[in-house]
Amino acid sequence: MVSVWWLLLLGTTVSHMVHTQEQPLLEEDTAPLDDLDVLEKAKGILIRSILEGFQEGQQNNRDLPDAMEMISKRQHPGKRFQEEIEKRQHPGKRDLEDLNLELSKRQHPGRRFVDDVEKRQHPGKREEGDWSRRYLTDDSRYLDLLSDVSRRQHPGKRVPAPLFTKRQHPGKRVTEEEGDTEFENSKEVGKRQHPGKRYDPCEGPNAYNCNSGNILPDSVEELSFGL
């Protein structure tokens, strides 16, 4: 902007000098005075232009906040002060909500918060929900789980199969441990007795493998002898 005014001043001085050379001089001392007047006028014009430019710059700076206010009014009410809120937040937490939203959208609807729930649980119980969903929904997988558990247990204390207990009578269900102990006790009693004086299966301390059909004839014979 200043260079333009200097060019304008130079052009006016040159034109004035040409114009003065064409006119006859009445007095010799008037020419230097005219040059000084032109220079003073050009200086005044230059100073005036600089002041006007400075005033225009100040006016633009004053109008800038008004323009920003107008833009903020045109925006959505919930997004006017978003930048100020982000500046007040912690630098490492500004985009945390956006990141969580993106991850939740990419994940399965039923598995969006599984990681948070597992982190809040006890370290030894984090996979309990996964085992229940993985094995209890499928019978074959549940049986595989039981087989794995039974292998890790003591041979005499393995978990009985659920199908075996379901087929028994509700009042006569016995565990595998009780059956094993009764069978072992019967073997020990048989070994301690004399070969010719061993107890009948329906007699002795632990009667087993007998039914009501075998007991009724013996009771009838005893009653007949008593009569």
Swiss-Prot record:
The keyword Secreted applies. The modification Proline amide is found at P77, P91, P109, P123, P155, P170, P195. Residues 1-15 form the signal peptide. Residues 107-128, 151-204 are annotated as: Disordered. One of its GO terms (molecular function) is thyrotropin-releasing hormone activity. It is found in: Secreted. The keyword Disulfide bond does not apply. The modification Pyrrolidone carboxylic acid is found at Q75, Q89, Q107, Q121, Q153, Q168, Q193. It holds the Pfam family TRH. It comes from the Eukaryota. Keywords: Amidation, Cleavage on pair of basic residues, Hormone, Pyrrolidone carboxylic acid, Repeat, Secreted, Signal. GO terms for biological process: eating behavior; histamine metabolic process; hormone-mediated signaling pathway; negative regulation of glutamate secretion; positive regulation of gamma-aminobutyric acid secretion; positive regulation of insulin secretion. Residues 112-128, 184-201 have a biased composition (Basic and acidic residues). GO terms for cellular component: extracellular region; secretory granule. PANTHER family: PRO-THYROTROPIN-RELEASING HORMONE. Belongs to the TRH family. This precursor contains seven copies of thyroliberin. This is Pro-thyrotropin-releasing hormone-A. It comes from Xenopus laevis. The gene is trh-a.
